[in-house]
Amino acid sequence: MRILLLGLFLCFGLLVKGQVLTGTIRNVAGEPLPFGTIWVSNLNKGSIANEDGKFAINLPVGSHQIVFRFLGHSPLTKNVEILASTKTLEWQITLVEQAVSLNEVNVGALKEDPAIGIMLRMISMAPFHMKELDSYSAKAYVKGAGKITSISKLMNMMVGKKLEKEAGIKVGSTYVLEGVNQVTYKKPNAIQEKVISNRNNLPSALRANETPNLRVTQTNFYQPKIFGNLISPLSPNAFQYYRFQYLGSFTQNGQTISKIQVTPKSSFQDLFDGTFSVVEDTWSIYSFSLHFKNANNNVTMQQQNAPFQGVWMPINYDLNMVLDVMGFGASFRYITQIKEYKIQVNKAFVVKPQIIEERLDK
């Protein structure tokens, strides 16, 4: 019940001296795109726009390639030359909604939804993707804000005044945090996060061992289960729990990206629904927007990936959560950007395996 993202927060800047690039990210209708990603490809660093689409990022002298991203929109790449005499630059960025083409695909002698073959390949490759790195390190820049939105009359009578007086928890108050985590991974599955810096106004009752930064970077959808017991759409048993529908594809940098609708077969289990975008040929996660709901939680999680040495790694997480627990209502939003990747590819997994699908059409 702790965390999250402040509406108007300062953008993440590159921690170097230099000139400032500022601007606003909008869609074609002129509406701001909140929390869009600004990525400096040659520096392996980036920033995030605020809730009004505004951004500011420091750039050192030199040539830079800037990539602007927002989920569901085509990335925009721009080049800039920063001189010693350069002052503040201002760009107005417009991102176009990603157009997907719905192509008819035949599998075997019969027609079937292309999502079936795509997801079979994704599921087959999931164990490979979990082993293709020996190690990596990165920094996770996090911003969050949340608040207690409501308290039942009964709970208010029982503990309302005590919570406010002793714990500093007050309905309607916004609690914010900003922090930097050092993330390290070593195979087979040892991932650690160390809090480098952390600033927040969270009441003591909402802090967890003085390190309230959520470990969203430890969430891996290639694993069969997420958050303990939620079935991943890439689980070996995913077809028992989900229906998949092909929504179309688009091409980016010569690679085909396919978009898949994910729908749970049962409403009585904790399952995801939403969309999954897949990099074909490597069968890697490009992005997703997935939602799950149960008696106490209503959660939406979005993730965007980018390639590093041929491996598609997460660069942005966006977590929205609405809670209703024991008479308390709360909401929060938590943004995490991963920067400064240093990865060591497992030499045994440099060459991607060829997937041969053998199925009998009936």
Q: Model-found features: residue ranges?
A:
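Hydrophobic beta-strand segments
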Residues: 36-40, 66, 107, 138
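A short, solvent-exposed loop/turn motif at the edges and junctions
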Residues: 40-42, 67-79
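Structured interaction patches on ligand/partner-binding surfaces of diverse proteins
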Residues: 47-48, 74-90
